[in-house]
A protein has these predicted regions:
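Structured, active/binding-site neighborhoods that engage oxygen-rich ligands
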Residues: 1-379
């Protein structure tokens, strides 16, 4: 299995878990059983068009990946680049405009924004929406609120997919990205831990358990001004690891970790599910979706972790064929794998430029259907 297959698996697994858990988000467990049977939801609950819909969690994850590649392209072509998280505001605000005005700015900042499903109004995070409406993002130095919510977590996924050599950088970038909308240290540090888990699995080909050990070791030496919060998160992660090998029933294990509305709880539930079903993405996502809490986020985390571990080629077709935006997600995943193929002195690449410089790729592609794909992309 190559890195491309693992990155594809991570992004499709994330979206698939989100789509599986979305119809049962916040439903009581009794209601889930009443609607879907004793096993709960085990397959997509399709919309009227036969599509498994993603939510704002996946939408913002994709926009974050788009933002990283935009930043890298700017750095490659201009030789200078601001901190990566500082490029996200335009992508998030453009997405927010569609949520509130039904139309985005004339100058879209991300090529995926041309696809209506990338900004359809579904399972919006109240915390993020309040921040977007204020037109002012937070930072680790100036928190914008005191939210510990899990709405920041999936934005960490592309960070783990994009970086591998510097754990401290990954932790810091993911924490700064979370701090844009969530002001509590527990949200920041949970996002950092999640990004690092992703990186270890994808780039080092570690098992999920091995990735957890390395992540805990890195956490123990990070955020020295926030050790109380770090240790709180580490206890939650260790509880998930312990429960994964226990005789506890699925629901009892999940209940002991929380409902998933708080970042550390969502991460722990997703991790628990992935550890119990490391080679079975259907089992992991089903486990993580069938509880009376933040089902789409916990199932997305589980799907991402197992998808990264087993790769796209091992994900059952039933979770791919009907998934909303599947072709866009795969194309973006391949771009994450390739990263910017240009430099300020090398040849141009029209496909890449229209994605990550001009940001008009969908329009340009319609006018240039025969344009060649990126020659630097691994196939």
């Amino acid at each position: 299995m190559d890195r491309r297959d693992r990155i594809r698996g991570a992004m499709i697994g994330c979206a698939a878990g989100d789509a599986l858990g979305y119809p049962v988000e916040a439903l009581s467990e009794a209601t889930i059983i009443e609607r879907y049977g004793l096993r709960g939801i085990t397959d997509y609950d399709l919309d009227e068009n036969g599509t498994a819909r993603i939510t704002a969690d996946t939408q913002l994850m994709l926009l974050s990946a788009n933002g990283i590649l935009f930043a890298h392209t700017r750095g490659a072509l201009r030789g200078i680049m601001a901190p990566v998280y500082q490029y996200f505001d335009g992508f998030y605000f453009d997405w927010y405009r569609v949520q509130t005005t039904e139309r985005a700015s004339r100058s879209r900042v991300g090529w995926i924004s041309a696809y209506p499903s990338s900004s359809a109004q579904r399972a919006l995070s109240p915390t993020s929406m309040r921040v977007f409406s204020s037109d002012k993002f937070g930072s680790m130095d100036e928190p914008v609120n005191d939210s510990k919510g899990s709405g920041c977590l999936l934005r960490a996924v592309p960070i783990g997919l994009s970086y591998s050599d510097d754990p401290a950088y990954i932790l810091d970038l993911a924490a700064n990205t979370a701090a844009l909308t969530h002001g509590h240290k527990l949200a920041w540090i949970s996002s950092g831990a999640f990004a690092l888990l992703v990186s270890h699995i994808v780039h080092e080909e570690l098992s999920i358990a091995e990735a957890v050990k390395k992540t805990l070791k890195a956490l123990d030496n990070s955020f020295p001004d926030s050790l109380t919060v770090v240790h709180e998160l580490m206890r939650s992660i260790r509880s998930a690891v312990s429960l994964a090998s226990s005789a506890s029933s699925d629901l009892d294990a999940i209940h002991s970790l929380g409902e998933g509305w708080v970042a550390k709880e969502a991460l722990a539930i997703g991790l628990l599910s992935a550890l119990r079903h490391e080679n079975d993405i259907a089992g992991a996502m089903t486990f993580a979706a069938n509880h009376g809490g933040n089902s789409n986020t916990t199932a997305a985390i589980a799907g991402m972790l197992v998808g990264a571990r087993i790769g796209f080629s091992a994900i059952p077709d039933r979770f791919i064929d009907r998934l909303e935006l599947v072709d866009v997600i795969l194309e973006l995943a391949d771009d994450v794998t390739t990263d910017c193929p240009m430099s300020d002195w090398g040849p141009s690449n029209p496909v890449w430029e229209h994605k990550y410089t001009y940001c008009d790729y969908a329009y340009w592609r319609r006018r240039n259907p025969e344009a060649k794909e990126d020659p630097g992309k691994s196939k």
